[in-house]
Swiss-Prot record:
Modified sites of kind O-(pantetheine 4'-phosphoryl)serine: 37
GO cellular component: cytosol; membrane
Residues covered by the Carrier domain: 2-77
Name this protein carries in UniProt: Acyl carrier protein
InterPro entries (UniProt xref): ACP, ACP-like_sf, PP-bd_ACP, Ppantetheine_attach_site
GO molecular function annotation: acyl binding; acyl carrier activity
Database matches in PANTHER family: ACYL CARRIER PROTEIN, CARRIER DOMAIN-CONTAINING PROTEIN
Gene from which the chain derives: acpP
Length: 77
């Protein structure tokens, strides 16, 4: 597991209060991990802070799964 993947998963676990084993690459924040719209906004803000980047709203809307978050951060580091 890459350092970025580990960091993204750690943020998801902390922000959504889910178990590590539930945070699979294909997991949807809303459908699989029980996030609501506020959770997803806070999750994006936590990713921005952790990786010292700004995620535009139109990009943030596309980050709906664990893998999408990992991919976005990996491409925009």
């Amino acid at each position: 597991m890459s350092n970025i993947e580990e960091r993204v998963k750690k943020i998801i676990i902390e922000q959504l209060g889910v178990k590590e084993e539930d945070v699979k690459s294909a997991a949807s924040f809303v459908d699989d991990l029980g996030a609501d719209s506020l959770d997803t906004v806070e999750l994006v803000m936590a990713l921005e802070e952790e990786f010292d980047t700004e995620i535009p709203d139109e990009e943030a809307e596309k980050i709906t799964t664990v893998q999408a978050a990992i991919d976005y951060v990996s491409k925009n580091q």
